Regions:
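Sec/Tat signal peptide C-region and signal peptidase I cleavage site
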Residues: 19-22
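Short, surface-exposed polybasic-aromatic patches that bind anionic ligands, especially phosphate groups
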Residues: 24-324
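Bacterial N-terminal signal peptides
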Residues: 6-17
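N-terminal secretory signal peptides that target proteins for export/translocation
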Residues: 1-3
């Protein structure tokens, strides 16, 4: 989606510490509402793969071939921001309390790989792309009291107080979870979505992003690397990227000329990388919408291209084999 450019007033970062996931959920310490401030709480345990520092991981032997297939000069694209043509840019989420009523969800595309629920989805839960969106229509709900995450793909209100969706997954954020092998989630790779989003409260509020960032590519392989659990491709080429693949911004890439916001994102890409989660436009990194984003600052990320990355070691990859 093309991004409308809006210049907002400059601001100073107020850096606050990132807090580990507690033994008990944070509850009222986290705000309620759409795209709410998580007050520095990590969504997943400290030892989650999403929080793993990959800056010292070896480069995969197939890195250059994979990057060439993507296209050396394809730009990084921030697929989040303020709004475009009346719809928020990015994947929104909503934080609810533990007493949010649960409703029925009917699954229409992958019911056998979806968690049946019920799900605590408010009637006014934001939908990716807006109520009339034509894209993936993700719905993400975080229960702050149970520290549980509920996610839907291709979600529509059913007119009876419930929802219908293509697929859905429920995540207990107090521990590390993976979907069963070859199961999808609300994302093609079988991963949770919210933990990989770039959020305003991280970039501006905390001044740091301490997790891998979700991203998409046009062409992928029938393969995945855990914690991913699912592929969404008909191609077997070994120089195509598998789901769950991580690309890392090169350590010597100079960040000094970028805006403070862009530097936060790029430093995360050096430390934690970006994790391939879905088929989509090349090098699109995903975040949550917020009217306070400085679009001119985010647009600077487009100066980075595929050639500035490297694919980290893909040990543990699960690959399908063509039938003979």
């Amino acid at each position: 989606m093309p991004i409308a450019i809006r210049c907002l007033a400059a601001f100073a970062f107020a850096v606050s510490p990132i807090t580990s996931v507690p033994a008990q959920p944070p509850g009222p310490q986290v705000d309620l509402g759409i795209n709410a401030d998580l007050k520095g709480w990590r969504l997943l345990p400290n030892d989650s793969p999403w929080h793993r520092d990959i800056s010292g991981d070896p480069v995969d032997p197939n890195s250059e071939r994979i990057l060439a297939r993507i296209g050396w000069h394809k730009p990084l694209h921030p697929d989040f921001g303020t709004e475009h043509e009346g719809a928020p840019i990015g994947i929104p989420y909503i934080v609810v309390s533990g007493n949010q009523p649960r409703v029925r969800v009917t699954f229409t595309e992958a019911p056998q790989e979806s968690d049946p629920g019920p799900y605590p989805i408010p009637r006014d839960a934001p939908i990716e792309g807006g109520p009339n969106g034509k894209g993936d229509r993700h719905v993400l709900v975080l229960d702050r009291d149970a520290w549980m995450l509920y996610e839907l793909f291709n979600a529509f209100p059913d007119g009876k107080g419930g929802w219908r969706a293509g697929s859905g997954a429920i995540w207990n954020l107090k521990k590390n979870q993976e979907r069963p092998p070859r199961w999808t989630s609300a994302d093609a790779a079988g991963l949770p979505i919210l933990p990989g989003l770039v959020r305003y409260d991280e970039v501006v509020g905390a001044g740091k992003v301490e997790h891998a960032i979700r991203f998409t590519l046009v062409k992928t392989r029938r393969a995945y690397i855990p914690p991913a659990s699912h592929w969404a491709s008909k191609a077997f080429d070994d120089d195509l990227p598998p789901m769950g693949m991580r690309m890392r911004l090169k350590a010597d890439y100079d960040l000094s000329s970028f805006s403070p916001e862009a530097q936060v994102v790029l430093q995360a890409l050096k430390t934690y990388g970006m994790m391939l989660a879905d088929n989509g436009s090349d090098n699109f990194i995903t975040g949550a919408p917020d009217p306070r984003w400085d679009m001119a600052a985010l647009r600077q990320l487009r100066r980075v291209t595929t050639k500035d990355f490297e694919v980290v070691d893909m040990a543990g990859m699960v690959a399908d084999q063509p039938r003979r």
